[in-house]
């Protein structure tokens, strides 16, 4: 689906984008970096950093990870998304995960 025909992001997603953007900005400032310096370290443009800090959701996941790496916070991201680091994931740790999930019939 192209960006031009995507549905608007739900409010919780927009809030999370702004929160992540604010966190990136705070980390950048804590590291004493300008937007340009961070962009150079991450191999992106300064405008990409500006967009990320403003909560622009069109930035690719790889770019987010490169910026997190440049800020020294990359290690925390995979852990934050690890299902076994959550209560639900731990509860289901004994369940066998299927190799493939098939759509359920609605009939």
Region roles according to the model:
Residues 22-38, 99-106:
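Short basic helix-loop element that most often maps to the first helix and adjoining turn
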Residues 24, 35, 46, 61-64:
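Helix-turn-helix DNA-binding elements, focusing on the entry/boundary residues of the two helices
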Residues 56-69:
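Short, basic-rich loop-to-helix N-cap that marks the start of a DNA-contacting helix
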Residues 32-50:
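Short alpha-helical DNA-recognition segment
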Residues 6-30:
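A short, Lys/Arg-rich alpha-helix, primarily the initiator
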Residues 78-107:
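Short, charged recognition helix plus adjacent turn
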């Amino acid at each position: 689906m192209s960006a031009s025909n995507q549905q608007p992001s739900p409010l919780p997603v927009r809030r999370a984008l702004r929160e992540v953007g604010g966190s990136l900005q705070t980390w950048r400032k804590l590291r004493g970096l300008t937007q340009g310096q961070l962009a150079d370290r991450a191999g992106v443009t300064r405008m990409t950093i500006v967009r990320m800090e403003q909560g622009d959701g069109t930035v690719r996941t790889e770019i987010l990870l490169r910026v997190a790496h440049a800020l020294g916070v990359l290690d925390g991201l995979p852990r934050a998304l690890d299902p076994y680091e959550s209560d639900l994931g731990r509860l289901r740790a004994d369940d066998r995960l299927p190799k493939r999930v098939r759509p359920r019939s609605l009939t």
